[in-house]
Amino acid sequence: MKFYSKLSLFLTLVLVLVLAFSTVSFALELDRDKTLVVSGAMWGPPSTWNILIPNCTPGTGGLVYEPMFSYNPVKDEYTPWLAKSGEWVSDDEYVLNLRENINWHDGEEFNAEDVVFTYELAKENDVFYSPIWNWMESVKAEDNYTVRFTFSEPHYAEWNAELYERYIIPEHIWSEIPSDQLITNAMKDPVGTGPYTAKEAGQDRMVWERNDDWWGNDVFGQPTPKYLVDLVNQSNNIVMGMLMKGELDLSNNFIPGVQRVKKQFGLKTWYEEEPYMLSWNTALMYMNTTREPMDDTQFRRAMAFMVNKDNIVNKVYGGLVKPSNPTGLFGEGWESYLDEEVVEDYGFEYNPTKAKGLLIDAGYVDEDGDGWREMPNGDPLELKIMVPSGWTDWMSAVRSISADAEEIGIKITPDFPDSSLFDNRRFNKNFDMMIGVFQTTLSSTPFDYWNGVANSSIHGEQITNGNWGAYDNPELFKKIDQFNMIKDEEEKQELASEIQKTLLIDMPSVPLWHNGLWAQQTTQYWTNWPNENDPYGVPVSWGNAYQLGMIETLINIEPAK
């Protein structure tokens, strides 16, 4: 109780200081009643609207450029977007039927040639989605509104995600850009088909203006806000103050302690009570299997039983997140493949006694009586667990893990390199343990998750596609690939069970908690936010995630006045 008393006192002092003294340089020259103000996505001034760059200005994808489908990860439902339908017409051919009467912002007609061009560009140039041509054979326009994709090796799971992740670009504009400028061109006046256009970019914000001629007005309804202002991230105290004063409508920032003031200031969250936030990804503890003792399966399983996930959930996050189940899977699209029997037989839970037993059986004992276990050969057993410096919640989490390790006689020291050094170390297997979330974000298929935690690309000079601990299991890699390349649902369920079983037995990484889709809303200017009882959309302004329910949110929120 002391922890919570101190936290309450700290939050009270913060609120007093924020409300009394903080001043935010935020002067809108726009009609506030028609403007939605968001934050949490931008970490610096907007500088590029080039959709071929994954970290382009948030909103470029979704507000300006649009995908063929949108996807609601809460409902596990696809909504036809630029496409009106799509289907596999054979094992290796997919036909996409496009909507008619869609125009680009400059008035040019959108048609099948734009879709073909979007993919052909990735075949002829090196862009981030070019690897699709490793398994795609051709893409052809059969008429103005029909596109046929032919695959040399169909990747059904990946294609299901491709349908809502790929933003279509206008051929008549991008075909004029030289190949050597495709990535360097900032595209300051982006021309898309979407519901908003770029109005103004400043050092502290990006302003989008509604496209009142958007084709989707007649199909989905017109977005309610005339303007959307996305603010560059400020400190947690400033963001909290802006929320409490109604200067901010939607915050996608992680705000420690927000659950303690949400009722007082009328803040809305996805859940009314704990965990408050919708789960967004899985945080795992990776172990470097190329180093001792992490190369020992018995030791890795002991680490799984060692960690008190509830301490992380409650003491670090104050109940804002959920503990992960042993498989790491969550959400409708993934949990449909979760095998409860496998979890029952091979899963784990916090049990320091079990962890100690596993260590003793494997020869990790305290020979000299100093309170710390040694390696089976008698060498000292001292490890480090790293997270990036400044990631305060993760830093607290690994301190908690370190305390859990001490309880069972294992010395694991928290290590906080700066973000660039952290990346260098994980890419080069230069660590003992680390926390990571790569490719664990909620999606339509658990293939994404497995292809991240057990990616097969581990034998090059660097590891850049997940599986940071270089866990090497060719048989498992083959099963994950098979899951990607079959359509039969019964076969997929069988493979999913086998994959989960192998990961739980070998335990190359330990799923710990689900980071939240941090989302706090106010109702001074806008109401009818989506929530657990009305999940019509998802209030997320991060990156290019607007196709995951943010556009539907913009359409369905209502003016408070």
Predicted regions and their residues:
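Gly/Pro-rich hinge or "lid" segments in bacterial periplasmic/extracellular proteins
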Residues: N72-E77, E165-Q222, Y227, N237-I238, ...
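Aromatic- and charge-enriched surface segment that lines or borders ligand/interaction sites
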Residues: K84-F128, E142, R148-T150, P293-M294
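Surface-exposed binding/hinge segments that line
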Residues: E87, P131-E176, Q524
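Detector for C-terminal structural segments
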Residues: N55-G59, D204-R205, R210, A304-E341, ...
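Ligand-site clamp/hinge motif
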Residues: T184, D213-V261, R399-S402, K411-T413, ...
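Ligand/substrate-recognition segments at binding pockets and active sites
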Residues: V38, Q203, S235, V365-T441, ...
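Local pocket/hinge segments that shape ligand/substrate recognition
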Residues: A41, E162, G221, N252-L358, ...
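N-terminal lobe/hinge region of extracytoplasmic solute-binding protein
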Residues: S39-V89, E120, V191
